Regions:
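N-terminal amphipathic/basic leader segments beginning at the initiator methionine
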Residues: 2-45
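Mg2+-dependent prenyl diphosphate-binding active-site environment of isoprenoid biosynthetic enzymes
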Residues: 34-35, 39, 45, 49-202
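Short "domain-exit" segments at the C-terminal end of structured domains
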Residues: 203-207
């Protein structure tokens, strides 16, 4: 468990205030939450196991494919600014990774993607049906975990965010091919990607 903020720890290691702004690198901050990220990785893999072998296979295929885990890392870093990183922030970070992974499985079907994270996309191996349903499972798993945290505000934030992400997917589907409407394009980016990233620094992780 972290007792001091990794962000503040890195700031204290550099020189003047001007140097602090120039010298802090993401990898230096992430290094300070290495033990927590290792524990998170164990949670992510262990808790996804089910009695349905195909679900296990598809979920492990994408979760073990080398993702950067940037979104859950942001959850932990944001939480560390206000309190030590205990189990609640770790579980929220886990939820965020499940949600993100679910969107990747769905997105690859919508886009007809052949690869994901330098390997064959799940849909290329097990088909669209298994890929979509595995994404649905991860989504359901994430919201089940949210209910165990007994934090209504957090549940509302996550519910609203996933609604916006679905709107973004549909907006992209309905967008005219070859359209150069910049406003619509930026709206799609916000709904599909940015809104999930923004909640990492705003979501309440305390019960």
């Amino acid at each position: 468990m972290i007792t001091n903020s990794p962000v503040r720890n890195v700031q204290n290691e550099v020189g003047s205030p001007e140097q602090k702004n120039l010298q802090i690198r993401p990898e230096e901050i992430l290094r300070n939450i290495g033990p927590e990220m290792d524990l998170l990785e164990k949670f992510i893999i262990h808790d996804i196991d089910t009695d349905v072998e195909l679900l296990n296979t598809v979920a492990h295929h994408i979760l073990l494919a080398g993702g950067k885990r940037l979104r859950p890392a942001l959850v932990l870093l944001a939480s560390s600014l206000f309190e030590s990183i205990g189990e609640s922030p770790l579980r929220v970070a886990q939820v965020v990774e499940y949600l993100h992974t679910a969107t990747l499985l769905h997105d690859d079907v919508v886009d007809g993607a052949e690869t994901r994270r330098a390997q064959k996309a799940a849909r290329q191996i097990w088909g669209n049906e298994a890929s979509v349903l595995s994404g649905d499972y991860l989504l359901s798993k994430a919201f089940h975990m949210l209910t165990t945290l007994r934090n209504l505000e957090l549940l509302q934030i996550m519910s609203r965010t996933t609604t916006l992400m679905a709107e973004g997917e549909i907006l992209q589907l309905s967008r005219q091919i070859g359209s150069e409407d910049e406003e619509v394009y930026l709206r799609i980016i916000y709904l599909k990607t940015a809104c999930l990233s923004l909640i990492h620094i705003s979501e309440p992780t305390r019960p």
